[in-house]
Amino acid sequence: MAKLVTENISKRFKNQDVLKHINITLENNEVYGLLGINGAGKTTLMKIICGILQQDSGEIKLDNRPMTRNDLHKVGSLIETPATYNHLSAQDNLKIVCLNESVDFSEINSVLSLVNLNVDKKKKIKDFSLGMKQRLGIAMALIKKPEILVLDEPSNGLDPYGIQELRELLKLLTEQGTSIIISSHILSEIQVLADHIGIIHEGELKYQQRNNKDENLEEIFFKITKGDYK
C-alpha cells in the first residue's frame, strides 16, 4: 500500500519550470531513492513534500487522502544542512525541537543513541565535525517519531563507518514502520539502500522502477542525463 503519492507536482521559479508533473509513490515501510544531478529538482520536490515550499499545481496524498498542513507533524526531514544553534549543545538543540514539536525531553538520549551521537553534553555544535552535524540533523528529524522521513544527501560528511551505520539505521527504521525518501549523488549507495529508485532530470521524472540490483544503474543514469535514454 502506498504511504505517500505525489500527483502531477509542478513548480516554477520565475520563468523556469523546476518540476514538471512529478508522480512518485512511496510504499509503506520502504525506502525511495531519488537521484539526479545538481539542479535537477530533487531538493525542491523534497521541500514540497515537507511543506517548506508550496507546489504550483498537483497534489500530495498521504494514506490515500489529500495531505494537509495538519499532516506535517508526521513528516521528519533533513534538507540540505541541519538548522542548528551553533553556540548550543546537541542536547540543547534537541530540547528546542522537542518544545516546538511537543515531544518529551526523555526522548533525547534515546534518539542520540539511535544515531550513534554520544558526545560530551557541553560540546557546542560549532565544534562538531560535518559528520557529527549530519547525525544531529537526522536525530532532529527523528525525535518526533515521524511516519515519513525525508533525507536530502544524508551521507554527506560521513566516513565509511558512518555510512554503514546509516544503512543499518534506515533498515531499522523501515522495520519499525517508517517510510523514507532519500536523495544522494552516490548511485551505488542508493542501489544498496532503496527499494524503489527515481531519477529526476531537468525537472522531469525520467525513470521510476523497483530496485533491481542486477541492473546497471550507472549506465541508465548517464544515458538519462545525456539525453540518450529511451
Give the residues covered by each predicted segment:
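Conserved ABC transporter NBD signature motif
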Residues: 58-73, 207-209
